[in-house]
């Protein structure tokens, strides 16, 4: 799929990320249509996925997404909790439409209901849990891209990206790689420059574990310092109210004592 171009080939750094996230580890069962993507089978029965074919299908899926003129017509879906955060982040950076959580039955086929949508392309996290949108897409001829494990059914799926879709880190990494490839094909970011968005943002975090981590971080913090009260010398101030009151009392004359008796008569008598 890379056409022999080194710039499109799978880099060592990406291979390391996939191995750390256990993207290459499939399930113990194999669907007959997924046998072509299995590299070998381990002694414990776990099937190893060929990461070279995973990368080729990832590039093919990115080209299909870029071919859609209006990015909002591409719907990215995840019913499983481990893929919901990755779907929301993917939609944020690629301007696609996310459906995280329960899918409303009839959203693609029932034109009466308010939630009716007409997408041009679907990208689902798991064909087993997202079977309802895949089935409805087959009724209205909507192409489907899916992250598939070794035991995933490929019915009604047009582009299958083989990977470990049962691991939170693996599925988060695959959505991150797909988002990066889409942005590169659009010309938003360069292939020679590292994408500044870290893959950790696409990983699912259990709310209970997140609360425990926050509580543990608070316990490691040093106790807050209590500042001791400092006694500052109080300056002696005079009470201006007393001074004003004293001046007022001393300066007021008694008008009753100096009352001048006058008479209306000429002799001065009343």
Curated annotation (Swiss-Prot):
Keywords: Cytoplasm, Developmental protein, Nucleus, Ribonucleoprotein, Ribosomal protein. It is found in: Cytoplasm; Nucleus. Residues 261-270 have a biased composition (Polar residues). CDD domains: RPS2 (cd01425). PANTHER family: 40S RIBOSOMAL PROTEIN SA. HAMAP family: Ribosomal_S2_euk. It holds the Pfam family 40S_SA_C. Belongs to the universal ribosomal protein uS2 family. It comes from Drosophila ananassae (Fruit fly). It comes from the Eukaryota. Required for the assembly and/or stability of the 40S ribosomal subunit. Required for the processing of the 20S rRNA-precursor to mature 18S rRNA in a late step of the maturation of 40S ribosomal subunits. Required during oogenesis and imaginal development. The keyword Ribosomal protein applies. One of its GO terms (biological process) is translation. Component of the small ribosomal subunit. Mature ribosomes consist of a small (40S) and a large (60S) subunit. The 40S subunit contains about 33 different proteins and 1 molecule of RNA (18S). The 60S subunit contains about 49 different proteins and 3 molecules of RNA (28S, 5.8S and 5S). Interacts with oho23B/rpS21. This is Small ribosomal subunit protein uS2. Residues 251-270 are annotated as: Disordered. GO terms for molecular function: ribosome binding; structural constituent of ribosome. The gene is sta. InterPro entries: Ribosomal_uS2, Ribosomal_uS2_C, Ribosomal_uS2_CS, Ribosomal_uS2_euk, Ribosomal_uS2_euk/arc, Ribosomal_uS2_flav_dom_sf. GO terms for cellular component: cytosolic small ribosomal subunit; nucleus.
């Amino acid at each position: 799929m890379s056409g022999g171009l080194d710039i499109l080939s799978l880099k060592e750094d990406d291979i390391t990320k996939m191995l750390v996230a256990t993207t290459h580890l499939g399930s113990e069962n194999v669907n007959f249509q997924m046998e072509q993507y299995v590299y070998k089978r381990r002694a414990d029965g776990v099937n190893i996925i060929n990461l070279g074919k995973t990368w080729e299908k990832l590039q093919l899926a990115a080209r299909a997404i870029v071919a859609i003129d209006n990015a909002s017509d591409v719907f990215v879906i995840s019913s499983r909790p481990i893929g919901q955060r990755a779907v929301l982040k993917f939609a944020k950076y690629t301007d696609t439409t996310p459906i995280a959580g329960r899918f409303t039955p009839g959203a693609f086929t029932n034109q009466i209901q308010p939630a009716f949508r007409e997408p041009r392309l679907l990208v689902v996290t798991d064909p087993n849990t997202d079977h309802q949108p895949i089935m409805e897409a087959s009724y209205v001829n909507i192409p489907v891209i899916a992250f598939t494990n070794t035991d995933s059914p490929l019915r009604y799926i047009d582009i299958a990206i083989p990977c470990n879709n049962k691991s939170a880190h693996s599925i988060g990494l695959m959505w991150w790689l797909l988002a990066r490839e889409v942005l590169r094909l659009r010309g938003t970011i360069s292939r020679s420059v590292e994408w500044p968005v870290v893959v950790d943002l696409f990983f699912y975090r259990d709310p209970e574990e997140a609360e425990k981590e926050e509580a543990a971080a608070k316990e490691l913090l040093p106790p807050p310092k209590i500042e001791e009260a400092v006694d500052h010398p109080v300056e002696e101030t005079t009470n201006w109210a007393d001074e004003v009151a004293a001046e007022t009392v001393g300066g007021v004359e008694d008008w009753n004592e100096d009352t001048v008796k006058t008479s209306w008569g000429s002799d001065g008598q009343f």
